[in-house]
């Protein structure tokens, strides 16, 4: 058996095709069982996210795995094949380790993919489609992903606007958990900001939005308070951090409103991060002594620097992945030798048992014990050295010095 992986991701296929080959969470267990039944080992793991669908199997038949995917989703071979990537053996190990470490992600180094791969592995174990090889592969992969995070800076620098906004707040406030945050807007970016804030221990969040129902839906998830845009002047003085991202054509926060809020705060500093285009916060707010205003352009320059840092870290991460994939394949090859060793030992023991049984029978018939022991030793020696002797003779006749050297080493003939 050999490891096989096939997949489609954001680099190779359109959203339309990625949607067609994705696996619904409520059907993933049955899908894994179905795929595993097509392999001789019964081992299969399916990783299915919005950006990728990948099938990992312990089987030698790559074509059969592709055929199963096409059949399961009722897609034509011509539609699927041009978008597929295929790996075997060590390539599978290396690819899975790269994916789990965030090296193959749309956003280089993003950490979410590791959790998604872990979840896929758990589901495969629940489905009963994981045995020794797949278990070792995925457990090793998780250790490698952790090593990449620990030994490189692949995930240290912010590379999304939302993450960069929260990272900036962390640099200014020593403990985000003690801050009060006002979020303006309730779109995808602000939702991501809220998630990052929550992960950093922020409990006091207010979400202001033109549509209160949208803000309330978001607040329910994060334990925040929803208000309308008209209520901002009442809540602004309480905010240590303001992060805004709306689609408003005109500024929502003017210099006068912020100045009034700062007076009510007795000039305690306020961080304002405007990640909207066009701007939500008037540029003149930056002129106020206790207001620290940053725009999307400020964040973008930080992101560009951080991306360069991540690319540098990724080079080191690639070396870790390559080395660890080699180590895993050494283990795989050692497994392949187990059957040969077991067969060789079994064969030797069968020879021993046969000759011992003959000697015992002759001894029972009154044979000379000393003579029988010598005869047993000679026959056993001749039987056991027959195959190695034949191999040495054939290698010598062929002039195959490499094989001859390997045989001598295996038989312990080159020891000092």
Curated annotation (Swiss-Prot):
GO MF terms, alphabetically ordered: glutamyl-tRNA reductase activity; NADP binding
Cited Gene3D superfamilies: Glutamyl-tRNA reductase, N-terminal domain, NAD(P)-binding Rossmann-like Domain
Pathway per the UniProt entry: Porphyrin-containing compound metabolism; protoporphyrin-IX biosynthesis; 5-aminolevulinate from L-glutamyl-tRNA(Glu): step 1/2
UniProt record, GO biological process: protoporphyrinogen IX biosynthetic process from glutamate
Top-level taxon of the source organism: Bacteria
Keywords of the record: NADP, Oxidoreductase, Porphyrin biosynthesis
PROSITE patterns, sorted: GLUTR
Binding site for substrate: 49-52, 105, 110-112, 116
Catalytic activity field: (S)-4-amino-5-oxopentanoate + tRNA(Glu) + NADP(+) = L-glutamyl-tRNA(Glu) + NADPH + H(+)
A Pfam family: GlutR_N
Important for activity, annotated site positions: 95
Catalytic EC class: oxidoreductase
Residues where NADP(+) binds: 185-190
EC number: 1.2.1.70
Active-site residues, as the UniProt record annotates them: 50
Family listed: Belongs to the glutamyl-tRNA reductase family.
HAMAP family given in the database record: Glu_tRNA_reductase
Summary of subunit composition and partner proteins: Homodimer.
Alphabetical list of NCBIfam families matching this protein: hemA (TIGR01035)
Its biological purpose: Catalyzes the NADPH-dependent reduction of glutamyl-tRNA(Glu) to glutamate 1-semialdehyde (GSA).
More info: During catalysis, the active site Cys acts as a nucleophile attacking the alpha-carbonyl group of tRNA-bound glutamate with the formation of a thioester intermediate between enzyme and glutamate, and the concomitant release of tRNA(Glu). The thioester intermediate is finally reduced by direct hydride transfer from NADPH, to form the product GSA.
Comment text on domains: Possesses an unusual extended V-shaped dimeric structure with each monomer consisting of three distinct domains arranged along a curved 'spinal' alpha-helix. The N-terminal catalytic domain specifically recognizes the glutamate moiety of the substrate. The second domain is the NADPH-binding domain, and the third C-terminal domain is responsible for dimerization.
Official protein name in the record: Glutamyl-tRNA reductase
Gene from which the chain derives: hemA
